[in-house]
From Swiss-Prot:
Belongs to the universal ribosomal protein uS8 family. HAMAP family: Ribosomal_uS8_B. It comes from Prochlorococcus marinus (strain MIT 9215). One of its GO terms (molecular function) is structural constituent of ribosome. This is Small ribosomal subunit protein uS8. The lineage of its organism: Bacteria, Bacillati, Cyanobacteriota, Cyanophyceae, Synechococcales. It comes from the Bacteria. Keywords: Ribonucleoprotein, Ribosomal protein, RNA-binding, rRNA-binding. Disulfide bonds: none annotated. Part of the 30S ribosomal subunit. Contacts proteins S5 and S12. One of the primary rRNA binding proteins, it binds directly to 16S rRNA central domain where it helps coordinate assembly of the platform of the 30S subunit. One of its GO terms (biological process) is translation. Pfam families: Ribosomal_S8 (PF00410).
Length: 133
Protein backbone atom coordinates (compact mmCIF):
# COMPACT_ATOMS: atom_id res chain seq x y z
CA UNK A 1 0.00 0.00 0.00
CA UNK A 2 1.40 3.38 -0.93
CA UNK A 3 1.46 6.10 1.65
CA UNK A 4 0.78 9.58 0.32
CA UNK A 5 1.40 11.42 3.60
CA UNK A 6 4.14 9.78 5.69
CA UNK A 7 4.07 12.55 8.32
CA UNK A 8 0.38 11.97 9.07
CA UNK A 9 1.07 8.24 9.18
CA UNK A 10 3.87 8.81 11.70
CA UNK A 11 1.72 11.03 13.92
CA UNK A 12 -1.15 8.54 13.82
CA UNK A 13 1.11 5.64 14.78
CA UNK A 14 2.53 7.59 17.73
CA UNK A 15 -0.94 8.75 18.83
CA UNK A 16 -2.41 5.23 18.66
CA UNK A 17 0.54 3.63 20.49
CA UNK A 18 0.46 6.19 23.29
CA UNK A 19 -3.31 5.77 23.76
CA UNK A 20 -2.80 2.01 24.10
CA UNK A 21 0.14 2.64 26.49
CA UNK A 22 2.69 0.79 24.35
CA UNK A 23 6.32 1.33 25.34
CA UNK A 24 7.53 1.58 21.73
CA UNK A 25 6.15 2.12 18.26
CA UNK A 26 7.64 1.46 14.83
CA UNK A 27 7.38 3.85 11.91
CA UNK A 28 8.70 3.58 8.34
CA UNK A 29 12.10 5.23 8.05
CA UNK A 30 12.65 8.48 6.19
CA UNK A 31 14.78 11.57 6.67
CA UNK A 32 11.73 13.68 7.52
CA UNK A 33 10.37 11.16 10.06
CA UNK A 34 13.78 10.93 11.72
CA UNK A 35 14.06 14.73 11.89
CA UNK A 36 10.61 15.04 13.47
CA UNK A 37 11.45 12.27 15.94
CA UNK A 38 14.65 14.08 16.96
CA UNK A 39 12.67 17.27 17.65
CA UNK A 40 10.15 15.28 19.71
CA UNK A 41 12.99 13.73 21.71
CA UNK A 42 14.69 17.09 22.25
CA UNK A 43 11.39 18.56 23.52
CA UNK A 44 10.89 15.61 25.89
CA UNK A 45 7.91 13.88 24.26
CA UNK A 46 9.67 10.59 23.42
CA UNK A 47 12.45 8.78 25.28
CA UNK A 48 14.57 7.12 22.59
CA UNK A 49 15.09 6.70 18.86
CA UNK A 50 16.51 3.54 17.27
CA UNK A 51 17.01 2.98 13.55
CA UNK A 52 16.83 -0.48 11.98
CA UNK A 53 17.57 -1.58 8.44
CA UNK A 54 18.80 0.39 5.46
CA UNK A 55 17.30 1.92 2.38
CA UNK A 56 13.60 1.55 1.68
CA UNK A 57 13.24 -1.18 4.34
CA UNK A 58 14.48 1.03 7.17
CA UNK A 59 12.35 1.52 10.25
CA UNK A 60 12.51 3.88 13.20
CA UNK A 61 11.61 2.56 16.65
CA UNK A 62 10.46 5.26 19.06
CA UNK A 63 10.34 4.85 22.84
CA UNK A 64 7.24 6.56 24.24
CA UNK A 65 7.21 8.42 27.56
CA UNK A 66 4.57 8.27 30.28
CA UNK A 67 4.20 10.12 33.59
CA UNK A 68 2.76 9.14 36.95
CA UNK A 69 1.87 5.74 38.31
CA UNK A 70 -1.16 5.53 36.00
CA UNK A 71 1.16 5.92 32.99
CA UNK A 72 -0.45 9.07 31.60
CA UNK A 73 0.95 9.70 28.07
CA UNK A 74 3.35 12.64 27.73
CA UNK A 75 1.85 13.31 24.29
CA UNK A 76 -1.75 14.39 24.81
CA UNK A 77 -2.47 15.47 21.25
CA UNK A 78 -0.78 15.59 17.86
CA UNK A 79 -2.37 17.56 15.04
CA UNK A 80 -1.21 17.74 11.44
CA UNK A 81 -1.31 21.35 10.22
CA UNK A 82 0.28 21.59 6.77
CA UNK A 83 -1.06 18.83 4.52
CA UNK A 84 -0.12 17.78 0.99
CA UNK A 85 -3.27 19.44 -0.37
CA UNK A 86 -2.89 22.66 1.64
CA UNK A 87 0.57 23.77 2.72
CA UNK A 88 0.76 26.26 5.62
CA UNK A 89 3.77 28.59 5.77
CA UNK A 90 4.48 31.18 8.48
CA UNK A 91 7.15 33.82 8.84
CA UNK A 92 9.04 34.35 12.11
CA UNK A 93 6.53 36.78 13.62
CA UNK A 94 3.54 34.62 12.71
CA UNK A 95 4.87 31.33 14.12
CA UNK A 96 2.20 29.87 16.42
CA UNK A 97 2.62 29.32 20.16
CA UNK A 98 0.91 26.05 21.04
CA UNK A 99 -1.01 26.23 24.34
CA UNK A 100 0.75 29.46 25.24
CA UNK A 101 4.19 27.85 24.98
CA UNK A 102 3.40 24.55 26.73
CA UNK A 103 3.16 22.67 23.44
CA UNK A 104 5.41 22.59 20.40
CA UNK A 105 4.87 23.44 16.75
CA UNK A 106 7.25 21.50 14.52
CA UNK A 107 8.49 23.64 11.64
CA UNK A 108 10.29 22.63 8.44
CA UNK A 109 12.69 25.46 7.62
CA UNK A 110 15.51 26.04 5.17
CA UNK A 111 17.87 25.05 8.01
CA UNK A 112 16.10 21.78 8.77
CA UNK A 113 13.22 20.60 10.92
CA UNK A 114 13.00 22.33 14.31
CA UNK A 115 10.63 23.46 17.03
CA UNK A 116 8.88 26.82 16.91
CA UNK A 117 11.10 28.07 19.77
CA UNK A 118 14.30 27.28 17.85
CA UNK A 119 12.91 28.88 14.67
CA UNK A 120 12.07 32.07 16.58
CA UNK A 121 15.57 32.18 18.11
CA UNK A 122 17.14 31.81 14.67
CA UNK A 123 14.71 34.31 13.13
CA UNK A 124 13.41 32.04 10.39
CA UNK A 125 9.98 30.84 9.35
CA UNK A 126 8.84 27.84 7.38
CA UNK A 127 6.18 25.21 6.86
CA UNK A 128 4.19 24.35 10.01
CA UNK A 129 4.13 20.54 9.99
CA UNK A 130 2.25 19.75 13.21
CA UNK A 131 1.33 20.73 16.77
CA UNK A 132 2.26 18.50 19.70
CA UNK A 133 1.12 18.96 23.29
Amino acid sequence: MSNHDPISDMLTRIRNASQKKHTTTTIPGSKMSLSIAKVLQKEGFISEINEEGEGYKSQIILGLKYSGKNKFPTIRSMQRVSKPGLRIYKNTRALPKVLGGLGVAIISTSKGVMSDRDARKQGIGGEVLCYVY
